[in-house]
């Protein structure tokens, strides 16, 4: 049994959190769709009008439910290929010993498979002013 789930099967989060995750997914998928070239041959489309790799990306995007502090977002979760970390979302507020406070919903870039980068949040899913790419949360500027 996989520890990865789709958004609709995610438990332990309220509707506001899940709605914010839905908005985040849409932004990620829009970024991937802009990245993909126009469909003009090659593999046949699974979904009419969609590039097959875009469909595959959407269908294999999932959530790792095993973390205590963070929700890990993964690509390739349900496919036969490699699974990669897209990023992390903070589950509850905490303050690091350095004084940086992280809030519920903060987007965190991956520092590795099990660890988010804790130098600064890249945005918050409850605010509308964050930017993401299909490869992960944006770098700091």
Model-derived features with residue positions:
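Negatively charged, low-complexity tracts enriched in Asp/Glu with abundant Ser/Thr
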Residues: 3-64
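Amphipathic, interaction-prone secondary-structure segments
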Residues: 45-103
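A cross-kingdom feature marking charged/low-complexity
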Residues: 73, 132-141
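A short, surface-exposed interaction/processing loop segment used at functional sites
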Residues: 97-132
């Amino acid at each position: 049994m996989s520890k990865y789930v789709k958004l609709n099967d995610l438990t332990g989060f309220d509707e506001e959190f899940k709605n914010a995750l839905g908005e985040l997914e849409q932004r990620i998928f829009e970024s991937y769709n802009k990245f993909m070239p126009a469909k003009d041959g090659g593999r046949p489309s699974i979904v009419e009008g969609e590039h097959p790799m875009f469909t595959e990306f959407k269908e294999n995007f999932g959530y790792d439910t095993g973390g205590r502090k963070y929700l890990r977002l993964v690509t390739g979760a349900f496919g036969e290929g490699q699974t990669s970390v897209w990023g992390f979302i903070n589950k509850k507020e905490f303050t690091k010993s350095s004084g940086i406070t992280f809030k519920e919903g903060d987007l965190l870039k991956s520092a590795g498979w099990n660890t988010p980068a804790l130098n600064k949040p890249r945005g918050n899913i409850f605010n509308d002013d964050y930017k993401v790419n299909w490869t992960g949360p944006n770098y700091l500027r």
